[in-house]
């Protein structure tokens, strides 16, 4: 799990820095990525690039990992502090969310969003 956690820590740092190319390089070519704005999923690196381009044109999201754990099927579960502002700096969201990552060949293959463990405890 440690190697995957280290990769994900970098992914969060790169996302928050808007270094899209580095984040996308950590993803499998055929990644399935949760669309937290519009629902459903986007597919492939190009789908994620398009989604983030739309997202970052309207909001300024930042996500900070708080806790990492391993799920029953080997997935990495991350409890995340999510802070979202509009482009004028107005706070839109400040909450905990759950992120679930599945890896293939050392790359992120799937990303899903769920309630954080603290919300269900």
Regions found by a protein language model. Give the residues of each.
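Short, low-complexity N-terminal intrinsically disordered segments enriched in polar/charged residues
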Residues: 1-29, 119-121
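A beta-strand edge to alpha-helix "cap/lid" segment located at domain peripheries
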Residues: 3, 49-121
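Hydrophobic pocket/interface hotspot
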Residues: 8-11, 23-24, 31, 44, ...
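Short acidic/polar alpha-helix capping motifs at helix-coil junctions
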Residues: 14-16, 28-32, 49, 60-65
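A short gly/proline-enriched turn/hairpin at secondary-structure junctions
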Residues: 32-42, 54-58, 114
